[in-house]
Every structure is written in C-alpha cells, then in structure tokens.
C-alpha cells in the first residue's frame, strides 16, 4: 500500500492533461514484498511478491563471489504440469507483464542495496509460454538506459517449446538458453513432463542446434536427478549419446523435493557417479551448488504455503 501511494503522489505532480494521457494509454504495474526468507548462510533469499491484482509470485536472490543473481518468475503459476515442480500445483493464472518481471529485480536491488549482475528466468512459469512479454523484458533489462545487464548474463529456461526456441533464435539475442530436459529418452520424459507428448527430445535437440547456429551461444541442459527414475548408469550413457555433437553444458540438479509430488532426490553418490560417466564421454558437466536448502527452496513452495495459509488454494 505505501508503494502504491508513493507512485500516485509522483503522478499527481504532473499536469491534468498529462495524467489523462497516461491513464488512456498506459497501465503502471509492479510488485510489492509480502514475505522474505533468508538462508542461515545469508547467501540466498526467497521473496514472495504481490501483484496489483493481489496474485502472488516468487523470486530468489543468490549471492556469489562473482556477483549477485536473481531468479525471477514469468507467469503466475504454470500450465506445463511437470510432476516434480510445485509451480504447477495450482495451474496457470496469468502471464506477467515485462514491467512485472522488471519490478522483481528493482525491488530486490532496493531491499538488498546491492546490484544484480545475473538474471535467470527460471522461477514460476514457462518463459516461452509468455513469449512477447519475455522478449520485451530482455530488451528492456539489457538496455543501457535501464538496468543495463548484459544479455550474456541472462539465462532463459524452457521445458522445450520447439517453435518458440526457433523464434527466439531468429531474434539473435546473446542470452543463454537452458533446456529443462530431465530425461535421456521420451518414455521417461513423458512420465514426468506432459510437454513430452507434444515435442520429442529429438525435435528439441534439432531446435537447439538451430539456436546455436543462429546465435553462437552454447546450450545448457538442466537435468534434475530423480531417484529411481532418471539416475541410473544406463541413463547417463543414453544422455551422453543423445547430446553427441552438440555444443552444450549439462547441469545436474539435486531435486528440491515437493511433498505433494511423489518424486525424491537421488543420493549424492548416484549424482557423482552420473557426472563421472558423462565426463568419460567428454561432456562438460556441473552439479548445481545447493543454496537456500534450509528455506522453501523448491520453485512454487513459498507461494503454495501462502495460498494455503490464506485460504486461497
């Protein structure tokens, strides 16, 4: 409420004619902080933000030696239905505007009093399902007159909307494209990701090759390690074969478990073994560093808890 009053006061300083023109042509939208969780190490903070229509979204701030990263949401909820993700539990409510995406970054910079140097569009929602606003956001946030973050420091994650990947490639931006793959074959992928019924892994890989040819940017493949589902030795070998000849980086993710979903994290030993096998096939592999494991780390968890507490779920 104070945030809204502050903006209204700024607008009242302008002429009546100017205010009427703004009212006819523009809508000012932003976010306000509702809740914040800080990890014990103080290197991670999770934010719950409310929008003008009182819907809520999440963002995460992560402090690294090389700079500060923010993971932002692109939609209120998500309609992709991945079985290991809390964001999909309530479905999709609506898309975020470019302004609402930008506002998450501005509010976190204001709260932390630190500059954000890296942006990850990997929070709630499927970014490419909100393509036009995502594109506006990227161009605005990388503009020198705005926050001025280099496109090379922006990562956009997608579950694999092939047509939109090709459209994004034609924009010839310098962002990093991250594919939420999470399976070495279509059979396993269909068990956990409904989008696999629409696009095969083969089609996604072809779109990734097109993206690389157009932009020269290496692709990242995100692979959540799910116990007993996709973490066996044969899965690692199959994944290596699938990605053969593609300029890519594989990011193994210890799964953030969601109690409403029957998915569990692979053991540390199995994750390390998986990594070793991929490296034998000369793949560039990292295991995502765990940050904020003592707070509601999984995407969508904090929002779900808030909605349940307030009888909105």
Residue ranges of model-derived segments:
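Acidic, low-complexity intrinsically disordered tails
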Residues: 309-313
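Single conserved hydrophobic/aromatic residue that forms the stacking wall/gate
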Residues: 1-7, 11
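Conserved beta-strand segments that form the floor/walls of ligand-binding pockets within enzyme
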Residues: 10, 71-73, 77, 84-86, ...
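N-terminal [4Fe-4S]-dependent radical SAM core
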Residues: 18-74, 101, 105-115
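Conserved AdoMet/S-adenosylmethionine-binding subsite of the radical SAM
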Residues: 109-118, 123-282, 288
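A short, acidic, flexible beta-alpha connecting loop/helix-capping segment that sits on the rim
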Residues: 289-295
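Canonical Radical SAM [4Fe-4S] cluster-binding loop centered on the CxxxCxxC motif
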Residues: 63-100
């Amino acid at each position: 409420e104070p945030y809204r009053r502050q903006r209204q006061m700024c607008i009242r300083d302008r002429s009546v004619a100017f205010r009427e023109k703004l009212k006819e042509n523009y809508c000012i939208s932003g976010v306000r902080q509702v809740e914040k969780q800080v990890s014990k190490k103080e290197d991670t903070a999770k934010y719950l933000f409310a929008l003008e229509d009182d819907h809520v979204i999440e963002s995460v701030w992560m402090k690294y030696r090389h700079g500060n990263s923010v993971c932002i949401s692109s939609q209120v909820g998500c309609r992709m239905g991945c079985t290991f993700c809390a964001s999909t539990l309530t479905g999709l409510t609506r898309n975020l505007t470019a302004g609402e995406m930008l506002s998450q970054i501005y509010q976190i910079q204001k709260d932390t009093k630190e500059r954000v140097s890296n942006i990850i569009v990997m929070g709630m929602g499927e970014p490419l399902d909100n393509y036009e606003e995502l594109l506006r956001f990227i161009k605005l946030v990388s503009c020198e007159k705005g926050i001025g973050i280099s496109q090379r420091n922006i990562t956009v994650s997608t579950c694999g909307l092939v047509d939109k990947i090709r459209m994004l490639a034609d924009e010839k931006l310098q962002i990093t494209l991250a594919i939420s793959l999470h399976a070495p074959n279509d059979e396993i992928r269909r068990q956990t990701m409904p989008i696999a019924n629409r696009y095969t892994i083969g089609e996604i890989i072809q779109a990734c090759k097109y993206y690389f040819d157009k932009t020269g940017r290496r692709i990242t493949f995100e692979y959540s390690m799910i116990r007993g589902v996709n973490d066996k030795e044969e899965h690692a070998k199959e994944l290596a074969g699938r990605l053969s000849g593609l300029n890519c980086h594989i990011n193994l993710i210890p799964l953030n478990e969601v109690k409403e979903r029957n998915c569990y994290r692979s053991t540390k030993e199995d994750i390390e073994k998986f990594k070793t096998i991929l490296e034998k096939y000369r793949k560039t592999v990292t295991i995502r560093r765990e940050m904020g494991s003592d707070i509601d780390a999984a995407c969508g968890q904090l929002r779900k808890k808030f909605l349940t507490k307030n009888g909105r779920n």
